[in-house]
């Protein structure tokens, strides 16, 4: 469904000045390539035993730190709209913030398992907050508040599921809220977005910072219950910016209506529910790392989907977050499929343990 909607929402972009050299199949073909790469990456993460990922968690964090630091280096990171979020690799652009989400799931899960005896106190709590703070500092400086919020939500959920005490969790939650407020208050463009979110159709905002939101709401409103029909969106014809990425759900709403929106939401609900059950099952079989990774993955998908949908429907201020598996984006789809491979691996190892079988995979020393 995601590939179809990317094709539908991007088919007219080649007619505009921004993508003058792009044909109607440009984004479709690139997304297809990204999906194929992602499927190979998913197969790799599925074939590697979970013990392998547990043992390499710290090295993954180090690679994540290096990539996030490199993206801020002039001449290495690519600047788009005053933000440095991409590293050019040939004809493609890699977004380290997507890798950071997956890395922090694995790293926080491994840390929580190793610090089970001290995670309830400051001795075990402070180090992971320092690790998190370093990643958040780099993300904020891109700047990418949306990715920062998702990473914080991932870490908070894993720590809570891993046994973090209510007092420390409340402290972390309050700190996260204050961080978001400070990030908004200290950045004039974020303040403008916030005020535009409060009244997007006002004369002051409708043609400026509220432009995306107003056209997103118009698209969803035009769709009604059953939609205008696949491919028949008007807003994607150079009215709604980023219709194939951050605001693809507005096109879904316009073309497929409430029925299409409900179907997408249902798929995410089923995915999150299944992932949480897989995680609980792993924890019940004394595979805490496996369980935390599985639950962390679906928390990531769920939180990011909620924010993306909320932005498209005017529930949240505009943020640059893709809809997992649906929006156009190479880094997003590849890393999301890698994470899905981990979820499948946890489920596979659960089934093998219940049957008394040895899980198969690459690397006998990790089995």
Curated annotation (Swiss-Prot):
Keywords recorded for this protein, A-Z: Cell cycle, Cell division, Cell inner membrane, Cell membrane, Cell shape, Cell wall biogenesis/degradation, Glycosyltransferase, Membrane, Peptidoglycan synthesis, Transferase, Transmembrane, Transmembrane helix
Subcellular location: Cell inner membrane
Leading EC class: transferase
GO molecular function, one term: peptidoglycan glycosyltransferase activity
Transmembrane spans: 32-52, 57-77, 87-107, 119-139, 149-169, 171-191, 251-271, 296-316, 323-343
Membrane topology designation: Multi-pass membrane protein
Pathway annotation: Cell wall biogenesis; peptidoglycan biosynthesis
Family annotation (PROSITE patterns): FTSW_RODA_SPOVE
Enzyme nomenclature, EC number: 2.4.99.28
Highest taxon, organism lineage: Bacteria
Listed GO CC annotations: cell division site; plasma membrane
Catalytic activity: [GlcNAc-(1->4)-Mur2Ac(oyl-L-Ala-gamma-D-Glu-L-Lys-D-Ala-D-Ala)](n)-di-trans,octa-cis-undecaprenyl diphosphate + beta-D-GlcNAc-(1->4)-Mur2Ac(oyl-L-Ala-gamma-D-Glu-L-Lys-D-Ala-D-Ala)-di-trans,octa-cis-undecaprenyl diphosphate = [GlcNAc-(1->4)-Mur2Ac(oyl-L-Ala-gamma-D-Glu-L-Lys-D-Ala-D-Ala)](n+1)-di-trans,octa-cis-undecaprenyl diphosphate + di-trans,octa-cis-undecaprenyl diphosphate + H(+)
Example of a GO biological process term: regulation of cell shape
Record's function text: Peptidoglycan polymerase that is essential for cell division.
PANTHER family per record: CELL CYCLE PROTEIN (PTHR30474), PEPTIDOGLYCAN GLYCOSYLTRANSFERASE FTSW-RELATED (PTHR30474:SF2)
Family to which the UniProt record says this protein belongs: Belongs to the SEDS family. FtsW subfamily.
Protein's name in the database: Probable peptidoglycan glycosyltransferase FtsW
Organism: Taylorella equigenitalis (strain MCE9)
């Amino acid at each position: 469904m995601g590939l179809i909607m990317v094709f539908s929402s991007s088919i007219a972009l080649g007619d505009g000045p921004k993508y003058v050299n792009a044909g109607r199949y440009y984004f479709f073909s690139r997304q297809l390539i990204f999906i194929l790469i992602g499927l190979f990456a998913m197969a790799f993460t599925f074939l590697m035993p979970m013990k392998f990922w547990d043992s390499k968690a710290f090295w993954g964090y180090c690679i994540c730190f290096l990539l996030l630091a490199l993206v801020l280096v002039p001449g290495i990171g690519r600047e788009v709209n005053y933000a440095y979020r991409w590293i050019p690799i040939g004809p493609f652009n890699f977004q380290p913030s997507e890798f950071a989400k997956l890395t922090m799931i694995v790293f926080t899960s491994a840390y929580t398992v190793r610090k089970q005896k001290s995670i309830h106190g400051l001795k075990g709590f402070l180090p992971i907050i320092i690790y998190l703070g370093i990643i958040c500092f780099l993300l904020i400086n891109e700047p990418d508040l949306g990715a920062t919020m998702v990473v914080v939500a991932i870490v908070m959920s894993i720590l809570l599921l891993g046994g973090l005490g209510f007092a420390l969790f409340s402290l972390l939650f309050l700190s996260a809220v204050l961080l978001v407020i400070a990030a908004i208050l200290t950045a004039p463009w974020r303040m403008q977005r916030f005020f535009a979110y409060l009244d997007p159709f006002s004369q002051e905002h409708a043609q400026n910072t509220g432009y995306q939101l107003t056209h997103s709401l118009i698209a969803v409103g035009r769709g009604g219950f059953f939609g205008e029909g696949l491919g028949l969106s008007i807003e994607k014809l150079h009215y709604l910016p980023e219709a194939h990425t951050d605001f693809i759900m507005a096109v879904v709403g316009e073309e497929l209506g409430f029925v299409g929106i409900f179907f997408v939401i249902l798929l995410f609900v089923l995915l999150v529910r299944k992932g949480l059950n897989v995680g609980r099952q792993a924890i019940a079989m004394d595979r805490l790392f496996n369980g935390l990774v599985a639950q962390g993955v679906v928390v990531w998908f769920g939180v990011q989907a909620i924010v993306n949908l909320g932005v498209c429907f005017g529930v949240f201020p505009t943020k640059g977050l893709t809809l997992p598996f649906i929006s156009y984006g190479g880094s997003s789809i590849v890393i999301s499929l890698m994470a899905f491979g981990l979820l499948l691996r946890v489920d596979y190892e659960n089934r093998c343990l219940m049957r008394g079988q040895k899980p198969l995979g690459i690397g006998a020393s990790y089995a």
